[in-house]
């Protein structure tokens, strides 16, 4: 695929600086790249802030959302916000990232364990995965063996999976995006 803007979304515990030279290297391949800094929030607050920051960059559709680490499960919700703003998502790349999981029924905390928190006994809600997800092709780029299970799951989902080591991450990501 030929992306409009490649949006690099860092792990909620990190900052955009964690991408290092990757954005600039991807630009050298002729890609339009934004790496928004979404600090100090997680879950749906990360989704909301990312949507605002992405909008401020005036990206070109179709977007390719690249998620790292714990932001992986948030990509479907971030995509919903982009589609609502008439910025279609053309693909997803999970870079050493956790994967979105199917919806599950809410968990009821065991009051004997002290997890009721005074909110009806429910645990904190997970970020929902839209029923129509994925509406665009997905790929997985593995850098670390710590993500062997996620890479395996991505392959079982029929997604292209690539591996890379520094300094070849940009080249591997570019090749993966072309296959989407």
Where are these regions (language model features)?
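Short hydrophobic segments within beta-strands
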Residues: 8-12, 66, 95, 141-143
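Nucleotide-sugar donor-binding loop of glycosyltransferases
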Residues: 37, 69, 144
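A short acidic, amphipathic alpha-helical/loop segment
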Residues: 21-22, 77-78, 150-153
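Generic structural signal for beta-strand residues in well-ordered domains
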Residues: 26, 58, 85, 131-133
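Serine-dependent carboxylesterase/thioesterase catalytic core
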Residues: 50-119
């Amino acid at each position: 695929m030929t992306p409009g803007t490649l949006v690099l979304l860092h792990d909620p515990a990190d900052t955009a600086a964690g991408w290092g030279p990757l954005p600039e290297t991807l630009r050298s391949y002729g890609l339009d790249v934004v790496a928004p800094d979404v600090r100090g929030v997680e879950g749906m607050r990360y989704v909301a802030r990312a949507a605002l920051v992405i909008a401020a960059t005036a990206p070109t559709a179709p977007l390719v959302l690249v998620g790292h680490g714990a932001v992986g499960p948030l990509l479907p919700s971030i995509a919903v916000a982009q589609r609502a703003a008439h910025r279609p998502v053309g693909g997803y790349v999970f870079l050493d990232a956790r994967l979105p999981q199917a919806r599950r029924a809410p968990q009821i905390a065991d009051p004997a364990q002290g997890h009721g928190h005074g909110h009806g006994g429910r645990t904190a809600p997970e970020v929902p995965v839209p029923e129509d997800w994925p509406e665009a092709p997905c790929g997985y780029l593995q850098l670390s063996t710590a993500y062997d299970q996620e890479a395996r799951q991505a392959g079982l989902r029929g997604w292209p999976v690539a591996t890379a080591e520094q300094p070849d991450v940009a080249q591997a990501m570019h090749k993966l995006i072309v296959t989407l």
